[in-house]
Every structure is written in C-alpha cells, then in structure tokens.
C-alpha cells in the first residue's frame, strides 16, 4: 500500500489532468509548433476552443478552404525544413485536405494533419460529417492513425511528428474522435525517439562508397543529377564540395532547384521534360550518371528504354524502395545524402573535365540562341513569361523564394529564376497540383517573414485557390503575387497544339478583372499589358512592404521549349 | 527482356495494426496485381504478425513491391520467395450429406487414401478436413464432387521458408540501441 501511494504521488507530479483537446494543443506546442493552418467545424471545435485559450503561444491561420491549409503547411515546411501543421474538421474538412496530403506524399514534404472525427460511438454509422478519412488517406500518407481514447493522444502526435520528419519525410494524418477530445487524461509529453519497425535512415555501406568513387574517379564524362534529397538532407555544402573536387557538371530536377546557386560554373541546369537542352541531351552521352536524392521520375527520364543506357548509374538515396524502381543502378548508395556525400568526397580524386564541360556550354549556346534569347529578351510585340522572370531576378538579385503553381509559367519560373539560397524553389513537382502556389506562398512567407516570397501563377491555377487572397489580407502576409495571364490553360493548350491538331478543347479562359478582385481584398494591385510598363511594375511590387498583386498579360499562344515529348527519349529533346 | 511471371510467396512481419492490411493491399492494387491468396496470423515472435501473400508476377516486380511494403512504417521486414524456397500448405473443408458416408462405400476409401480427417459427424452431414498442396486438395474435391458436396472452402496458402528470417535479430538490435 505504501509503495502505491508514493507511485501515485510521483505520477501526480509529472502529469497534469487535462482534456484531450488541450492535450492536442499542448502536444503541438511541445513539438515546437507556433503556427498552424486550418478551418474549424463541428468535430474539431473542442480543439479550436483550446487554440483560443493558447492564442498567444500558437497562432492559428484561418485559411479560406482546407486545401489552402494543407498547401500552406507544405509551403511552411518546404522553406523552413520544419514540420507544417494543418487542422480540419471531419467529413468534408478532412477530404478537402487530401490533395495537399497527396502532394506532400509525392514531394516528400513533412506535414502533420490533425482531423476531427465524429464521436467513437457513431463511427461506422454514416453519422453527420463522418468519412473514413484514415481509409481515404492511407495511400497518400506516410503514416496515419485514428485516436478514440484521450490517453492515446500525446503518443499519437509524438509518433506523427517523428514519422513526418525523419528519414524520407512525408505527410502524416491523425484523426481524433470528438469524445477523445472531450475526455480527460493524465498529460505527459514525451517525444518519439524511434519505432522498432521503422528504419528512417538505412546504413551506408562503405563498400558502396568505394565502388562509387572508383567509377567516378575513372570517368571521362561524369554527370550528376541531384534532386530534393540534397535539400531534405541539408547536404547543399557536401554536394558543392563533391562537384568542385571532382569537377563534375551537375544538373537538377525541378525539386532539386536552388540547392546549388544558379550562378555556379558547374551548375548545368534542369533535366526533364522542359529542362535545359544540354543536360537532357548529354544524359545519353555521359559515361557515369550520378543520381543524388532523386527518383528518376518519368518527367525526368522520358523513355526509360533509351535513358542513359551507355552510362554506369550510381544512385544515392535514403529510400531503398527508390533503388532500381525505375532505373537499374550499377552502384546504389543508401543513406542520408549529407553523410554519404561527405564520405564520397573523401574517396574522390581531385579532377576536372573541361572538354566535357565545354560540351554542355556549347549546347547551352544553341539553346540560348534558339530558345532563351527569345524568352528573356523578346523582340516580338507580346510580353513573354521569361522576360517577367528576368525582371524579377533583377529586383530580387536571386534572393527571393519563388513559389510556382503548375503549368507553363512553372516551367518558365524554374528555368529562369535565379537562386542564391537553398529551399527557394517551392513548387508542386510530383503531383502537379494547380492551385498550390497561392496558399503555399502564404505558408512560406509566414515561416520566413524576412524573405521575399514571390508566387508566380498562371491564370488557371490562380483561380483554383483564389479564395486564399482572404487569408493574405487577414494575416497581412506580405506575399507578392504575379499572375502570368495568357487566357489559356497554357500547358494543356500547348499539348493540344502539338499533339491534338490545335483542337483547343476547354482550355481558353474568359477571365475576370483580376485587379478588381485583388483590390476587393484590399491588396494593392496592378496590371501590365505593355513591355514598357513591366520593369517599373515589377520594381514597385518587389519594393512593396505589403502584399502586392501583379497581373501580366502575356502572349496567348507561346510554347515552352525545350521539350521532350511524352514517351520520347531525353536525347530527342526539341528546341521548337 | 520479357521476364517470366512466376508464383511468389511474400512474407511480411508486421506490428499488429488495424490499417496495415489496407496499406499493403493498396501496393498490389496500384500495379494491378491480383492477390491469389492472403493469410494473416501471429508469427513466431510474440506480438508480431505475419502475412503470407501469394501472387503471380515477375521477380523484378516482386523485388520492387517487397521494398515498397517494407517501407511502410509498421512493416518490420518483408521477403519474397519462390515455391521451391518454401514449404507450403493449404487447408480445406468439405460438408457432405451423412447418408453418403454409409451408402457410398467408396467415399470411405477416398477419405483414407488422401489422409483427410473427419472433423464431425451428425445425422445430416459430416465435415471433412484436409491439408496439403493445391493439387491434392483439387483432386479430392473432384473425387467428392461426383457424390455431391454441400459446402466447400479452402484457405489461403500458409508457408514457412527454408532459409532463416532475421526478424528477431532486428528487433533485438532495436531494443539494444
């Protein structure tokens, strides 16, 4: 009896008796969350009640749609490397998060989504606003769970944050029934330090480093293609050191952009469907292809049967399931890019490949002449998307974070934006989610208020989450919004022109007065239709201390080149 | 380059988690791979479940799928094996009219010859149980079908592998961290 009393006393000292909903908020705060994005509703109201009480410690951003909350959490995570948090009610609130969750899954973005759920005694009864969100979100989450007991809340949230952030990051959803929110528990928060069935970072085999280094040291025409794994692994410096020591030309996937400054002499540009001419073409000329933290997406490789067949492939990745998934590797190096690249650095000989690098420069000159010149220094009457990017570069000096949506403007933004700082290219890569940029830019700006955040969006994608202008206004988020308006769903129209005999089925848009809409939300707004107005308008936007909307009316039927037609070989990249 | 499609037994050691079956079956579904049979039970390790899944696919795909299964947070380890690398059995039950047992003496011979076991007998029916390879069960079903079967049911494959599974070591290594 005596020992029992002592034990009870000890427990009382360490824990607090609180409600499940308070435990949710306290668990989030224990994970260092000071901002979250969401939308209230019936099944999550107890949590909102607690958020009201703790509003001086944790800032809830009311988005105008749950999809906006999920993308804002993504933008927050992508620019900061921290876990983004979104919160929604059951039923439609939860299902509206799904697009953002799927986007985070395919782009390996750490977010935690908390959803309210109907009381546990109603589960399975088709109750009001009941959906099986755990079932729905299973294929698009790294992990998910449903909590029906108050006392399980802290552990579930601890596990959620650990899983979202560790190893290859990803989205996690925790669904919490309303009775678990109302119930009480003895609260004590312990961060999750490990899960026995889960190995976040596989061990790097020293032999694989030796084998990789040997291939690279003996290569005449080595080429690196890096992806977001470098950014997620915080291996930017290690990548740069490897490239410089071995003198290897290095290209990036869309999500790898900004890990190495644009101006770096060994940065040879973007690979993939609308990537640069040289790295695409020379993928089929190199003798060793070193893939780092990238997953050989079909938009990168084109036809796999003709992809880098002449080359030895070295694949660095944290995720064993990526090895040999699309492209068979000769050497696979598992592990965290920061550590494996540091080991590789030690094993590499100092080297240079000047004549090989010149091949890239020569092809760049061709691309410049045939594509880039016309994009950024156009002589025709209509404005181009490329010249808008050029003006933004002039004003940002390469220091802005560029948040792009999906389509032609995205390809132009990723091709032409200058980046000096890592984690600066925030875009929906794998899922290609139109509507991503506006809310993601809000999250990015709130995570990094000192940075300039420029959202570059097409007129189509802008209208998919245009309601988030309300969030920008309410939060005073100083996001700069550029809509490149060609009155078309441009990328689809481009495909219709090239592959569907110009049958422009449902791609032409009759657009509203975008300036009036922005002004309706009390956001400063400007519209540019002539070249001579562009520089001044971009300057004004970038100098603004508040959010600013700039619509640029660009040429209606411009195409993005280079282009690897779907299913063609990387070496068949077209310049026109 | 066209690789042969073979039968593979996929063994998965997992935590006992309510949603995991969904996660695992979704990985097959995405690639349009039909699950021939699926069994789940306790494994040799307390608190660890084991899935035994039989699928027909190429070895390249088996390898990719096993890695995608192993990637799931609550999967401890996943393996694939060919039929030759495993010892496997299925089990089945027949419900048959009791009168036949007395009227058709051949039935008694069939039961004896194929090592089937009578689980229960009552006035209306008797229940026969048999474990073995698919072809043995199929041949028994054909033999009994002549006389009429009231109900037939066959389980999924259960299998143990000839080589060692290093799951216990992995769990111990985690505990000793």
Which role fits each region the language model picked out?
Chain A
Residues 21-25, 29-34, 42, 47-52, ...:
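Active-site diphosphate/adenylate-binding microenvironment
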Residues 2-348, 352, 391, 395-398, ...:
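N-terminal alpha/beta PP-like core and its mobile active-site loop of ThDP/TPP-dependent enzymes
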Residues 2-15, 151, 189, 310-406, ...:
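Phosphate/pyrophosphate-binding active-site segments
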Residues 39-41, 60-71, 86-93, 148-149, ...:
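Active-site nucleophile and cofactor-binding loops and adjacent substrate-binding regions
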Residues 175-180, 407-409, 555:
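A glycine-rich phosphate-binding loop feature that marks nucleotide/adenosyl-phosphate handling sites
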Residues 173, 315, 403, 456-457:
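Generic enzyme active-site microenvironment
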